[in-house]
């Protein structure tokens, strides 16, 4: 067996991020061949990932990024098994690296993201291979549960991350420049995090969902003993309240509850002398489907 120097162990650790003892073992198993040792550690990570595939990964972080021109943004949920690992530097840096790859490529789904290269910092591994290697390094199942992308030509895309990185949002407002809607976009991104709307405007609420809610409210009113002739009016009122809860534009504005989000958007449009709108948003909360 080849003599394994401390420098070789350190070099392998610098290259892979794996612990010193594991690096020494890999070099011993491969007679000191650095490239074979790297491959040994990759296979070890893949084996560990397969072994832990049935484990639940419910902890993690939401990583969100926008391009320098604020025209595009990505949001990614990266999961692990424990909060201890989720708060560790290795995991958080890894999640950030994945979000940077997503921002550079705008993958249309999780599968497309997993197939992308992580670049030279990860020896050209794909995201999927890098996840396997990181699983081997930290000893926990790691997975990407979802990824979202917003791209635009004339809108501002703004991100908000709640402290702890368990909740984050992206919102697109336009047509506008960053200077025109910077304050509004930040406020709306925070609004989405705090108030958890489901859609931008009421036209986007699925009809089947409305019918379901209406039936629930009808049955509630009847159980409460309301006269049947008043039930329809009661249901209509409760549906309006439902809109105020789940429709972003109809929610009370978190910084001034005397206004709705729609009011604030209209005020900004008037100030800019052009019509702007909230075009779409994404809200990721750890563990939510």
From Swiss-Prot:
Q: Looking at the record, which segments are called Involved in Mg(2+) ion dislocation from EF-Tu?
A: 82-85
Q: Looking at the keywords, is Cytoplasm present?
A: yes
Coiled-coil residues: none
- One Pfam family name is EF_TS
**A molecular function GO annotation:** translation elongation factor activity
Sorted alphabetically, the Gene Ontology cellular component annotations on this record are: cytoplasm
Key word Oxidoreductase present: no
Q: Which domain of life is it from?
A: Bacteria
Keyword list, A-Z: Cytoplasm, Elongation factor, Protein biosynthesis
* Places the protein is found: Cytoplasm
**Function of the molecule:** Associates with the EF-Tu.GDP complex and induces the exchange of GDP to GTP. It remains bound to the aminoacyl-tRNA.EF-Tu.GTP complex up to the GTP hydrolysis stage on the ribosome.
Q: Which NCBIfam families match?
A: tsf
Give the family, as the similarity comment puts it. Belongs to the EF-Ts family.
Task: List the protein's name.
Answer: Elongation factor Ts
